[in-house]
């Protein structure tokens, strides 16, 4: 999980310095199942809209390797921080319990070895 508000993030100190009141609702994470597992999660959520624009009032999900960065070579994707397993979430104003249940439902459909 990549999130600047986590102490384990390499951007934690910068986030605390520049965003002391809290960071954004944008989170990225990878799935062990790689490209197919990540694409399936992005495609099958119900409460998250499959859109590339982030920071909206509605919750968004994107699998960059199959959408916004698909025209790049694998090396170019890696250089830009996009891995095949990467999911990017932008959390909006929907009820957090609905969002969590949506993600949990999709993740539970994946084989156990494909989870984070």
Name the predicted role of every residue range.
Residues 59-116:
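PLP-dependent enzyme catalytic core of the Aspartate aminotransferase-like
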Residues 1-46, 52, 72-78, 115:
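Conserved small-domain helix->loop->beta segment predominantly found in fold-type I
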Residues 32-35, 51, 93, 97-100:
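Electropositive phosphate-/nucleotide-binding environments in soluble metabolic enzymes
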Residues 43-65:
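Surface-exposed, low-hydrophobicity interaction/linker segments
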Residues 22-26, 56, 84-86:
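Active-site lining segments that contact anionic ligands and/or coordinate catalytic metals
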Residues 2, 42-45, 57, 93, ...:
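Functionally constrained cores in energy, signaling, and assembly domains
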């Amino acid at each position: 999980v990549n999130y600047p508000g986590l102490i384990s993030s390499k951007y934690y100190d910068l986030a605390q310095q520049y965003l002391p009141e809290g960071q954004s609702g944008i989170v990225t994470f990878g799935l062990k199942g790689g490209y197919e597992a990540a694409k399936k999660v992005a495609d099958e959520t119900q409460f998250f809209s499959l859109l590339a624009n982030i920071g909206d009032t509605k919750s968004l999900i994107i699998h960059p390797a199959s959408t916004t960065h698909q025209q790049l070579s694998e090396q170019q994707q890696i250089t830009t921080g996009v891995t095949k397993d990467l999911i990017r979430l932008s959390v909006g104003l929907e009820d957090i319990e609905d969002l969590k249940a949506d993600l949990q439902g999709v993740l539970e459909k994946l084989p156990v070895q494909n989870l984070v």
